[in-house]
């Protein structure tokens, strides 16, 4: 096994283990694109893990600076994740410099004190999942002004879904991502009741979450304009990944209280069903690039 093959084996293992939602879409891609996207995901995950980890803030900043510097000499690296990413960038137009935006988003996470309004939240989302969307597009293709905008918008929609899904978990970790002006306008103050669930005696939090979920749905409408521009297998991947998050968003829109005491998730079977439906609906979108995956019926346990 070559160094590059071993590197991809590692990044694909990281993706299979950690990408509990994205993996269902990624596995619909042909082998070369699947491997490249696993390399992008693995480095994105490393950056995110630094920001979300237990290290002291100054240590996190040092770690992120080290990652940023490592990208300057990526072709000479022996780090398996960077070896795989460098190879992916030789096969596809992956903009390595764009990972700096992802690191900037992680720096925002370290210094997070909340956001003043939705515009400020969008800056955060754009540097995070919006950047991931554009990195994925570099592998899906084709890259244009329009498709880059759609990919960014779709990433922003996914991150808004995460914020609503994880509102309690984030609050327990001392973080609030809901815009302050919207919290103030509706008179919402996040707190826990005696059972440890988010307290909402007057339904104001539910009203804010439903409003936010409706807005996120609008961002999906913008971002999903990307799909007709993609080849069949890339379209299926994109539709599967976004479809899983849209299912979660639909649960929140229907009953915001569902996130008051837990972090909602779809079962592995439901995620596999979403992926299968995405693949089936992509049949009329154009020619596939490569044979269909033989393992469609299998899915990770998470």
From Swiss-Prot:
Signal peptide: none annotated. Belongs to the phytoene/squalene synthase family. ATP is required for the transferase activity but it does not seem to be hydrolyzed during the reaction. GO terms for biological process: carotenoid biosynthetic process. It comes from the Bacteria. The lineage of its organism: Bacteria, Bacillati, Actinomycetota, Actinomycetes, Mycobacteriales. GO terms for molecular function: 15-cis-phytoene synthase activity; geranylgeranyl diphosphate synthase activity; metal ion binding; squalene synthase [NAD(P)H] activity. PANTHER family: BIFUNCTIONAL LYCOPENE CYCLASE/PHYTOENE SYNTHASE. Pfam families: SQS_PSY. Involved in the biosynthesis of carotenoids. Catalyzes the condensation of two molecules of geranylgeranyl diphosphate (GGPP) to give prephytoene diphosphate (PPPP) and the subsequent rearrangement of the cyclopropylcarbinyl intermediate to yield phytoene. Its EC number is 2.5.1.-. Its cofactor is ATP; Mn(2+); Mg(2+). InterPro entries: Isoprenoid_synthase_dom_sf, SQ_synth_HpnD-like, Squ/phyt_synthse, Squalene/phytoene_synthase_CS, Trans_IPPS_bact-type, Trans_IPPS_HH. Pathway: Carotenoid biosynthesis; phytoene biosynthesis. Disulfide bonds: none annotated. It comes from Mycobacterium bovis (strain ATCC BAA-935 / AF2122/97). The gene is crtB. Keywords: Carotenoid biosynthesis, Magnesium, Manganese, Metal-binding, Transferase. This is Phytoene synthase.
